[in-house]
Amino acid sequence: MAFGDVTTPQGLKELNAFLADNSYISGYTPSKADLSVFDALGKAPSADNVNVARWYRHIASFEAAERAAWSGTPLPQLAGGKPTVAAAAKPAADDDDDVDLFGSDDEEDEEAERIKQERVAAYAAKKSKKPALIAKSSVLLDVKPWDDETDMKEMENNVRTIEMDGLLWGASKLVPVGYGINKLQIMCVIEDDKVSIDLLQEKIEEFEDFVQSVDIAAFNKI
């Protein structure tokens, strides 16, 4: 018997001995078997059970949603002192044999590295499920008219008729440039992968009865 009722001191001791040679309750990755023992314990064990404490911290480091998605089969009823996991029989030993005073640092390092790699793999899998971030830019355009007789309101209306996938027009204002002439400053937000700022400038300049030139006054990544 590997371990029995983990809510009893004896069962906890047996679980500690089991986890001295095993990283997980079943197999080489966390599963519902680990979750059933984790839930049965209810709280972190004392530091005296060093192997159980290490395993408990590792399982607790996963979010509840991640633990719920683990595969495998939960262990049967844990109470009653009945065995939950089978293990190869070991010869009886004195209590002193349960404590390895000269444990291998290499084994501990390998275990820590393996757990680290598993965490990295789990994080990468979680991250891959998140939607990709969309690169956007905020652009301030200076749209200059031919002269002071240009209908600036009509010019702005024409500019705002331009529609492109990934283009969103923002606030605008008229800025004096001299001799009674105003230029139109208009803000827009573009998705970098969808909107070419050069093409947008060309489309604005197509309103040649109103627009003399278009310049980029400011360009910032969002």
Swiss-Prot record:
GO annotation, biological process: translational elongation
Signal peptide boundaries: none
Gene Ontology terms, MF aspect: guanyl-nucleotide exchange factor activity; translation elongation factor activity
UniProt keyword annotation of Phosphoprotein present: yes
Post-translation changes: Phosphorylation affects the GDP/GTP exchange rate.
Entry keywords, A to Z: Elongation factor, Phosphoprotein, Protein biosynthesis
One Pfam family recorded for the sequence: Arc1p_N_like
UniProt key word Acetylation: no
GO cellular component: a single term: eukaryotic translation elongation factor 1 complex
Residues that bear Phosphoserine: 104
Residue segments, region Disordered: 90-111
Family of this protein: Belongs to the EF-1-beta/EF-1-delta family.
Reported function: EF-1-beta and EF-1-delta stimulate the exchange of GDP bound to EF-1-alpha to GTP.
Oligomeric form and interacting partners: EF-1 is composed of 4 subunits: alpha, beta, beta' and gamma.
Protein name: Probable elongation factor 1-beta
Phylogenetic placement of the source organism: Eukaryota, Metazoa, Ecdysozoa, Arthropoda, Hexapoda
Gene, per the UniProt record: eEF1beta
